[in-house]
């Protein structure tokens, strides 16, 4: 596998994704789509990307270290807080596995 590459195309995609998140945050009807996918908290889009713990940072659902071919894949992008993204690192997030069943089951 190859390492993450910081290409012009990736920088442009990162900026476009940030702008889309900021536009969604400005629209109360669609704000939920701009929240941090890891903690569901509101992201501070008024500051530069990655400048504070509460600022926006593009996160990859499937970490680039696990599948570099998805680095520039829009469907692999998620809005996150810088802090949440850094805490997660390159681990795959634990998702909900479905409906809960009774403890006696």
Protein language model regions, located:
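Acidic, low-complexity intrinsically disordered regions
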Residues: 33, 70, 100-101
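Short, charged surface segments at domain edges that flank catalytic/cofactor-binding sites
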Residues: 1-41
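Short Cys/His-centered divalent metal-binding micro-motifs
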Residues: 44-45, 76-102
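Short intrinsically disordered terminal tails
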Residues: 1, 102-105
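Histidine-centered nuclease catalytic patch
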Residues: 41-77
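Short linear functional motifs in flexible/disordered or boundary regions
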Residues: 29, 48-51, 93-96
């Amino acid at each position: 596998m190859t390492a993450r590459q910081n290409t012009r195309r990736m920088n442009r995609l990162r900026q476009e994704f940030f702008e889309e998140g900021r536009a969604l945050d400005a629209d109360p009807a669609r704000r939920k789509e701009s929240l941090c996918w890891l903690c569901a908290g509101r992201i501070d889009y008024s500051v530069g990307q990655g400048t504070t713990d509460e600022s926006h940072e593009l996160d990859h659902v499937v970490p680039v270290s696990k599948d570099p071919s998805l680095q520039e894949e829009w469907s692999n992008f998620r809005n996150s807080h810088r802090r949440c993204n850094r805490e997660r690192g390159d681990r795959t997030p634990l998702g909900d596995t479905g409906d809960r069943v009774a403890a006696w089951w």
